[in-house]
Amino acid sequence: MQFADSRWLAKMVAAGACATVLSAAATAQDAPTADPATLKAQWERYTADAVANPVELAPMRVTEQATAADGATLRLVSLHPGVNRWHLVERVAPEGRAQSWHLENADAATWTLSLTKGDDPALLISGRGEASQCRPWAGETSELATAAGSGLPYAPVCGGKLFLRNKVAGSRTNREAVSDFLRKNVVFGDKLVNLIKGAFFEDAFLETAALGDGSGDNGDVVAALGQARLDRRPNMRTAMGLPVTGAPDGMEAGSWYAVEGQEGIFASVMQPGLIAQEILAERNGANWLDGVERNADVYLAAFDLGRFEIGYELGTDHPGLEWSSRPSRRGAEWNMAGPDGFSRADPLVRNGMLNPALLPRVAGAIAGGFKRDHGAFRFGDYAGFNRGHHYGFISNGVTFSRLIENLSTLYITTDGEIGMKLWQEADNEMIPRLAFARQNGVPLVQRDPETGASVPGDRVTSWGGGNWSGSAEAQLRTLRAGACLREAGGRQFLIYAYFSSVTPSAMARTFQAYDCDHAMLLDMNSPELTYMAVYRQNAAGDGLEADHLSRLMAESDPWAGGVRVPRFVTFSDNRDFIYLLRKE
């Protein structure tokens, strides 16, 4: 198994490096710390062939325990003090009955949690020069019991400083309860979200804009982003849903435009057939483009990461933790519930929704990657080792599926570093300081180490070897979405691209034209699964409205109260998502 050799971390722990990683984060927030011996033992468990649940894949966790006068045992597990978001409270009654609750910090930058000792243990919530005690498990009808019965994905406890994460059915939660809570407790409210299944047909969502003559003034183009490498730059009138400035006669292909009312967010459009011939003619790992994909509209959005934080949240159902049906299992693997040893998140709770306390800062959301069944290899060499290379993911410092070498990985560290790379075994050294990560397949483009040029990944032309999948009719050309990171002009950008009907080769050539450092596939086959929206306050000031990269995406936002309701951020969804928050 890929984590069998943990000698590097043993050396880290012996040298005190692992403890330093944790202590640095904990000291800044006055949080409890774990000793080096405990951290070493937890990492050794992390690297085991199989573990019982995702808590054991939180190697930086800190556990505090106290015994009450009645003999009950209380435990507080801070799952990653450097992230300071997720906490697990466990209570074991004197007769042995155990209960657990998954809590989320309403303000990780302010509040820290610890467990007091003595005959009447309590949660001690500290911050802003004050401290308060809370015993939400106490009483005949405890605060936690009331919160658990509320029907809310996030139910406030302890004076609203914490949320109880509740299990809900994605897109089927009690809408009235959620709507009422947001309206009363958040600046934006009265918004609901649902998931509407789309159809899967090759070219069903193909968009082709009419091309006009050259553009006029494009003064709103971001200087640092420049222009894509195209042979022609016609004006394009498209069905892109982001309102932009400076394009009354259409958007010039390959140029960038500021999105109206959204500082730090920019949009671009193009068609792969416009890409510079010097890129298209290269024999460096991409196929010739066919006539359909050459004329397929591509919509792109760029986020200036100097202005945004990135996070990642699991859906209520997807991606799953069980085995994919694609790779073959061997021997003892048939006795394992999933590739990491478990198939359920328990005792943690996946609720598929953004923490309500973050709503005032949310700027955008992007649908995540493949479902678990599609997120592993059926064919090629990668199907034959690393248990089929199931795509890994980390949320709030907890690994739900371990990161696997050879896969493209978007990651965010506890100190805010954002990266995208081909994961290697040596990169596991980063895991103690990862807050979020999502893997999805192999690279579309990477930097050539010798020339520095953006070039196609080495599996772009291999259908099975790249696990590129396709439409329901097994057509490689279909609606697809991908993302890349790019450094330009001293800035870092996350670029998301929606391709209305293309093969991986057209995606790679497009990301080359935009000079991306590393690009990866996300999801595919319908606007619902390739969803991307940016948010703004509605006219009434009591909720969010969404502008979608493609207008077709709006159809997966249901109607509620006569208006469309954005997904992910105001109601639980069964799919995972990446979100962007404006920095404070």
Model segments located where?
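Bacterial N-terminal signal peptides that target proteins for export
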Residues: Q2-V13
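Bacterial N-terminal signal peptides
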Residues: K11-S23
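A short catalytic or substrate-binding loop motif that flags glycine-/basic-rich loops and adjacent residues
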Residues: G291-N295, S401-I404, A474-R477, V569-S572
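Conserved hydrophobic/aromatic beta-strand scaffold that supports enzyme active sites
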Residues: L300-A302, T409, G482, F577
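Aspartyl protease catalytic domain
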Residues: L314, P319-S500, P504-Q512
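Sec/Tat signal peptide C-region and signal peptidase I cleavage site
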Residues: A24-A28
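Extended C-terminal subregions enriched in glycine
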Residues: R438, L444-R447, S454-D458, W468-E584
